[in-house]
Structures are given as structure tokens and as C-alpha cells.
Design a protein with these regions (language model features):
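Sec/Tat signal peptide C-region and signal peptidase I cleavage site
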Residues: 6-12
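All-beta strand scaffolds that present successive hydrophobic residues in beta-strands
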Residues: 17-19, 118, 138, 156-157
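Leucine-rich solenoid repeat scaffolds
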Residues: 129-166
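Glycine-centered beta-turn/loop sites at beta-strand termini
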Residues: 15-17, 24, 33-35, 42-44, ...
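Short glycine-aromatic motifs
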Residues: 12, 29-32, 73, 109, ...
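Bacterial N-terminal signal peptides
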Residues: 1-4
Length: 166
């Protein structure tokens, strides 16, 4: 929502058990799918976008704020979870998820079960992919990245500079 003065207000979007499509406002939004195969996207501001069940597509959307972390999350189901050009916290949760960080300094967590695929994108990223039995695949992209992973289980690309096998 935008006031006449040009100030962007935050909005809350709360979905249904059915498939929903939400695109956030220019302000900082809280978007939650609540079931179904949702398509959810933030748009400016510092957003929190959550899939909450179903096979969801969740993204931070365009216009994030550099150095201020947005939070984008899947949930149960096989989700696609993507950050944006700013700093993001990306979480897939359970299910076989595809997670992409984007251009900023991102924190990506792929350790809640399932077989996850991570593309950290550019920027100096931190990827946590340990504490689950799934065989995760991690590509760090550009930047100086740090990865905590399950040794002997996860597949970590050569472009991941700092590795911490568990």
C-alpha cells in the first residue's frame, strides 16, 4: 500500500488451503500461502514470504534492500525458493527443494530433510546443508562462500571456497 505522501506501507497476505498467487507491495510484507501449490513473491521492502504446505514457488521478488535480509521459505512439499538481488535468508524445509540465493550475501539452509538442490548465486554466501540424510547438491556460484555439509553424502561443487564437512 502506498500513501499519498509516497510512503510504502507493509502488507500482510494470508492465503487459503487452495493454490494462491500473491505479489507483495513496495513496503515490507508478510506473505503466507497456507497450503495448496502457491506462487508467492515479495516486491520491495524487507519481506517474509512463506509457502506453508503444497509444492510452492516462493521468491523475494524484485527490489530488495541491499544489506537487509529478506526471508523466503518453502515448507512441506517440493518447493522452489528464490532470493533476489539483495541479502536473503532462503530455507526449503522438508521436501525435495530447489533453492537459489540471488546476487546478495545470502544465508541458505538446506538441512530439514529431502534431497535439495542449492544454487547460491553471486555474493558471499553461507550454505548450511548438514543434519539430514538427504543427498543435497550445492553450487556456490560467484563470491567467497562457506558451506557446512554432510561429508560422504552431499555433493559440493568445486566453486565452494570454504568447506566444513560434518
Amino acid at each position: 500500500m502506498l500513501l499519498a505522501s509516497g510512503v510504502a506501507l507493509a502488507a500482510t497476505f494470508d492465503g487459503t488451503p487452495e493454490p494462491d498467487t500473491f505479489v507483495g507491495s513496495p513496503g515490507s510484507d508478510d506473505i503466507r500461502g497456507r497450503g495448496g501449490g502457491d506462487n508467492l513473491s515479495g516486491a520491495g521492502g524487507i519481506d517474509r514470504v512463506r509457502g506453508d504446505g503444497g509444492n510452492d514457488s516462493v521468491s523475494g521478488g524484485p527490489g530488495g534492500i541491499p544489506d537487509r535480509r529478506e526471508r523466503v521459505e518453502g515448507d512441506t512439499g517440493n518447493d522452489t525458493v528464490s532470493g533476489d538481488e539483495g541479502a536473503d535468508e532462503v530455507r526449503g524445509h522438508s521436501g525435495d527443494d530447489y533453492m537459489r540465493g540471488g546476487d546478495g550475501a545470502d544465508f541458505i539452509r538446506a538441512d530439514d530433510g529431502g534431497i535439495d538442490t542449492v544454487n547460491a548465486g553471486s555474493g558471499d554466501d553461507v550454505v548450511e546443508a548438514h543434519e539430514d540424510a538427504g543427498k543435497d547438491t550445492i553450487d556456490c556460484g560467484e563470491g567467497i562462500d562457506t558451506v557446512d555439509f554432510d561429508a560422504g553424502v552431499d555433493v559440493v561443487a568445486d566453486n565452494c571456497e570454504n568447506r566444513d564437512p560434518h
